[in-house]
């Protein structure tokens, strides 16, 4: 018999999640409710293809939609026009030098069709804690000293789970996404999780992956050796113009 209610999580952050395959069909992917955003629970969730997503006036909701949106890190779609703009860009890209500013901007930058944000203060503090533990990372795009775009997410093993991105200037988020995809591809990470389908992600080359296949990939990739600690030294500072020559679709 199909379930019509999500699982209720208890207060123990080490308690296991129910299998993601048991998520509801309506609303698509809702698996569990409650618990907290402790680092142990978040890492356990992501390692099993589950992520939190809820509004300020809701309890913590945990999701694993079917299908799942992913980017193959060698197949980000960049238009010829955008590549030409990149080749003449003076912007630079860094990693893990402005994580808190990126997550704050993702929470506060206005978005078409959205009223308010799901990146609550509680969510921000949870991901900042993961960042301080070396599990959450950001790619940041600068125009001089001004932050004009960025993306952040969670890394476990060799799997990156994207959370949100922003633009304070046209193209900023696209540059951040391209920089992240290129970095992951260079390191041999094949997938970037994009969570939930939307037209913008599809236009950039995101693909629908059946949840069962996604979970198989997650299980494989999270078991592989990670990049420990901060990425700032490993990544350094790179010109955004180099992305115009990147071998992405």
Curated annotation (Swiss-Prot):
Recorded GO MF terms: leucyl-tRNA--protein transferase activity
Matches recorded under SUPFAM superfamilies: Acyl-CoA N-acyltransferases (Nat)
GO cellular component: cytoplasm
Enzyme Commission code(s) on record: 2.3.2.6
Catalytic activity from the UniProt record: N-terminal L-lysyl-[protein] + L-leucyl-tRNA(Leu) = N-terminal L-leucyl-L-lysyl-[protein] + tRNA(Leu) + H(+); N-terminal L-arginyl-[protein] + L-leucyl-tRNA(Leu) = N-terminal L-leucyl-L-arginyl-[protein] + tRNA(Leu) + H(+); L-phenylalanyl-tRNA(Phe) + an N-terminal L-alpha-aminoacyl-[protein] = an N-terminal L-phenylalanyl-L-alpha-aminoacyl-[protein] + tRNA(Phe)
Enzyme class at the top of the EC tree: transferase
Keywords linked to the UniProt accession: Acyltransferase, Cytoplasm, Transferase
Subcellular location(s) per record: Cytoplasm
GO biological process, alphabetically ordered: protein catabolic process
Biological role: Functions in the N-end rule pathway of protein degradation where it conjugates Leu, Phe and, less efficiently, Met from aminoacyl-tRNAs to the N-termini of proteins containing an N-terminal arginine or lysine.
Similarity comment: family membership: Belongs to the L/F-transferase family.
Name of this protein: Leucyl/phenylalanyl-tRNA--protein transferase
Naturally occurring in which organism (per UniProt): Xanthomonas axonopodis pv. citri (strain 306)
Gene: aat
